[in-house]
Amino acid sequence: AGVSRATVSRFLNNGYVSEEKRQRIKKVIDETGYRPSAQAQTLRTKKTNLVGVIIPKINSDSIGRMVAGISLVLSQAGYQLLLANTDNNEKEEIKYLKVLAEKQVDGIILIGTVITGAHKKLLAALSIPAVILSQRLSGYSCVYYDDFQAARELTALLLETGTNVAYIGVTDRDEAAGRQRREGFLMAFEDCGKTAREELF
């Protein structure tokens, strides 16, 4: 390409290189099929361009849509996605948090089942950014919807229209969403001075 090694290095690491030299380097790379070593780049830049995504189940439509959106955004930003499926197993979530940290990914997105003390301890020890989806955890970047308020408003709407209301769904053991939904359901009854009968559950 007729340029110095330092110029090639800057090109490979997205540093400043004039457009004319950039085109010459790119032409030689395309002709030779050269691919820089990912390990060498990681050592040099301290970045892997990998983001780990831990999911509770792979066969969920809503999780699938989340992962598709995450994948699109990461790809547009030059990152690759590493996917870890836990089958709703808290121990597997902990294991994958450790594995991804050891792989030195640039970040972790956790779509967890239940955030336990072990999760909190491990998340606090991470030296990489972590984002938690579908749950609220104080002190962390979280993206979630308000299950409590959604259940409350839906139940209130049904009560106002005189529709027979029954609570269908999840149990108290489902801390990620179930408990909040149940509390929202009960609060809607309380708001209108009614009592939710036991057989509704």
Regions found by a protein language model. Give the residues of each.
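N-terminal helix-turn-helix DNA-binding module of bacterial transcription factors
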Residues: A1-T48
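Short beta-strand segments enriched in small/hydrophobic residues
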Residues: R5-R10, L43-N59, L157, N164-T171
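N-terminal helix-turn-helix/winged-helix DNA-binding helices
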Residues: D30-A68, Q76-Y79, D87-N89, V99-E102
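Bacterial carbohydrate/catabolite-sensing allosteric modules
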Residues: E31, L72-A77, A125-I132, R136-F201
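Cofactor-binding loop segments of dinucleotide-utilizing enzymes, especially the Rossmann-like FAD-
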Residues: P56, T86, T113, Q135, ...
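Aromatic/hydrophobic pocket-lining residues that form the small-molecule binding cavity
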Residues: I63, E93, A151
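Central regulatory/effector-binding core of bacterial HTH transcription factors
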Residues: L72-G117, K121
